[in-house]
Amino acid sequence: LDKPNRLQVKETTFNTYDYKLFGEIKGVDDYFDLIDALNYASPDDEFIIRIHSGGGSLGTADVIINAIQNTPARVHGYIESLCGSASTIIFLSCHTYSISPRAEFFVHTASSGTIGKEHENYASIMFDRKRVHKMIRDAYEGLLTEQEIDDVLKGQDYYFDAEELGERLEAYTEFQQKKFEAELEAFQKEQEDALDCGVKPKK
């Protein structure tokens, strides 16, 4: 008698993307290739974003971060050498991360300039201040202490070498995992409460 086939083979097709985020982060149109690849990726695809950048445009960083957070693919951030300012927020938005032995990581608040009438400048500055403060708190929560985040918002710069950054990333990963579990538990409870009340749960 023929023996049953115990081996099943599943053929899969996936892509691995290796992207170099080097130099100053400039206009968003310089990153359409990365953004489009993330937007059209499949769950089996993988991205490696290699970073050597002192930062740049927060607006462009925002668009890249949105693409990373919304892609079904897995995105790994790797610091080749320098990672500062806006590029640190991109790095921390990746799903996993690693660093080279010579990695440098620095954090500071945003800088900007405005041209126009005094009352227009004031309104613009206050709006940007509120937006940037929220971005900094969201990005570095778990990596920096609350006091360190407050210091950054007051103008303090922080610099970490590979050893200290590695230790902080371990704590940051644990913090993010606990945060995810708490949010998932709260969502599940909300769904259960909705069902108990006879209300259609959210999708």
Residue ranges and their predicted role:
Residues 1-6, 185-203:
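Intrinsically disordered, low-complexity segments enriched in small/flexible residues
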Residues 47, 75, 114-188, 199-201:
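Charged, glycine-interspersed solvent-exposed loop segments at helix/strand-loop junctions
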Residues 2, 18, 29-36, 44-45, ...:
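Acidic-enriched, low-complexity/disordered segments with a strong bias for Aspartate over Glutamate
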Residues 5-119:
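Cleft-lining beta-strand/loop regions that shape enzyme active-site pockets
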Residues 1, 96, 170:
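Residue-level marker of positions within ordered structural domains that often coincide
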